[in-house]
Regions:
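A short helix-loop-beta submotif of the ANL/AMP-binding
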Residues: 1-6, 126-128
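ATP-dependent adenylate-forming carboxylate-activation enzymes
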Residues: 4-21, 27, 46-50, 232-237
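Gly/Ser/Thr-rich phosphate-binding loop
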Residues: 24-27, 39-151, 164, 248
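Residue-level signal for inorganic ion chemistry
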Residues: 26, 165, 212-213, 241, ...
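Conserved ATP-binding/catalytic segment of the ANL
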Residues: 159-226
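C-terminal boundary motif of the adenylate-forming
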Residues: 206, 244-268
Length: 270
């Protein structure tokens, strides 16, 4: 029957649009889900003790069922499954309804580091977040979560079948395959640096492979080196700070300094 395509050109109104349009699929960046997590958590923390206790119990049940079992391709114990169904129809469905996500199907997210804390929350409330990784030079998708295979928090999924991934020097992720660019147009000098001797493309991202899943740690060029020689990965620090409701934007500063600091833009709309 096809699908209805909805385009929102006002980022600050996205949550209002969701409650109005009730999307079943939506592509987004991790920052969107960080905002959702912050808003829901703040509302529940301000609720009465009984409501708060019920909410966090529901989250614990959702986490155990959806992450410890479903994400690992394991069947939940009968008692857990029955408890989840009750919790899902009562507490978790109310949370999703407040978000406008009564019938969540698939919600791809990519473009930045996804905090495991946020990813855990999204799966716990019953939303199928599919984390992926891609580049302009890779015709978008390099890897993504597969519903029929184990999914680990913090990973960017498994490489798609036509892509070869290897880890090079400085733990750089290197790619090769039919969807990877053959080179930049009329940029011979750049192309000589962009590919290794075996034809693998240098992504500039650091990471590692574990049990078939790809994990990213940092953009190599973004790594800071403090004055005492220690390397700092700013994105991981920033993702931890961005789950605070009082912070809108943050930039970690550490290069050639004795300490790590951060430039913070407060959330003035509270």
């Amino acid at each position: 029957e096809g699908a209805e395509l909805i385009i929102n050109t006002y980022p600050h109104e996205i949550q209002e649009s969701m409650r109005e349009m009730h999307p079943t699929c939506m592509c987004s960046v991790p920052r969107f889900w960080e905002k959702v997590y912050i808003a829901v958590k703040a509302k529940m923390d301000d609720a009465g003790s009984v409501q708060k206790k019920l909410f966090y119990h529901a989250l614990a049940v959702g986490k155990k069922r959806n992450i410890e079992y479903i994400a690992n391709c394991m069947r939940p114990p009968l008692a857990l499954e029955l408890e989840y169904r009750i919790i899902n129809k009562t507490v978790l469905s109310m949370v999703r309804k407040q978000l406008g996500l009564e019938k969540p199907n698939i919600f791809p997210t990519a473009g930045a580091y996804v905090s495991p804390e946020v990813e855990e929350f999204v799966h716990a409330i019953g939303i199928n977040m599919v984390v992926g990784y891609g580049l302009t030079e890779s015709l978008a998708t390099v890897s993504c979560d597969h519903s029929d295979k184990k999914r680990s928090l913090g990973s960017v999924g498994r490489p798609i079948s036509c892509i070869q991934v290897k880890i090079g020097e400085d733990n750089e992720v290197l790619l090769k395959g039919p969807t990877i660019t053959p080179g930049y147009y009329h940029r011979d000098t750049t192309n000589a640096k962009a590919f290794d001797k075996d034809g693998f493309f240098h992504t500039g991202d650091a990471g590692y492979l574990k049990d078939g899943e790809l994990f990213l740690t940092e953009r190599i060029k973004d790594l800071f080196k403090t004055s005492n020689g220690k390397y700092i990965a700013p994105q991981q620090v920033e993702s931890l700070l961005l789950v605070d409701k009082f912070i809108d934007q943050v930039a970690v500063i550490a290069d050639q300094r004795k300490f790590v600091s951060a430039l913070v833009v407060p959330e003035f709309r509270l």
